[in-house]
Amino acid sequence: EKDKLINIEKLLEKRVIGQQDAIEKVSKAIKISKAGLQDPDKPLGSFLFLGPTGVGKTELSKALAEYVFDNEKQMLRLDMSEYMEKHSVSKLIGSPPGYVGYDDGGKLTDSVRRRPYQVILFDEIEKAHPDVFNILLQILDDGRLTDSKGKIVNFKNTLIIMTSNIGSQIPIDDNFDYTTKKNLALEELKNHFRLEFLNRIDDIILFNKLSKENISAILNNQIQLIEKRVSSKGISIGFTDEAFKYLKEKGFDPLFGARPLKRLLQDEVLNPLSEVILDIGENIEDKLIFSKDKYGLVIANKNLRVLRS
């Protein structure tokens, strides 16, 4: 664990591409906390991740769960579009006595009671009802929360992360430094959030838009993950330069970050690959090559016999 924390910045950079500034700031805050220099009555850290869709906000949250808590599944994701109504607060802390769902408990409080060491991700926080922010203020202030049954839940070993794309539409010159960009975003945030809320967050972290070079690196990472999955079946896969270039070009969209690339890999790599594996079964060749023809990607065996086009 000690080595993980010392090298957390390098580990995060391998997994989350193109966000060096964000990773540096989060890593420093994590080290302060794990060294015991953070306020002991507050969560380990609290961050507001700002940036457009598909640039790595959720991926960094998962990576923090893995490197800080040893498992990326040590994360509770709460979609704030499901907490837009006043009554939805009861889903977080449980329904009041006498109401339907009282015995079920709250999704947030029950999760932290069962797993006190985890990342809690409030996704698209700007969509939450104001009463949700009152709950967040309690967590950020006191590191604890009282559920509907009057039981106190300790949040002092959690990482609180909120995401938003507020400010991502502001026309910002790429030559601006990080501080200038952050100040512009902060002015926009003040139009949406109360100052008492913003002031309680440890840091507001800006995420960059992804470049073509970033997409190329992300594609490499995704291919390695696919290779790892299929290797368990005794199969190896490869991509020609033309196939890699095709995926990189078609998967790049500056508006939606890496999301189009992941959908493309699902449609043009995983779906046809699964058909080949299911069709051929145990007789499958040990090496499959993805190449490019005029219609798209083609899967061939090591002797270049086409298996799927």
PLM regions: where:
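AAA+ P-loop NTPase nucleotide-binding core of proteostasis motors
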Residues: 1-309
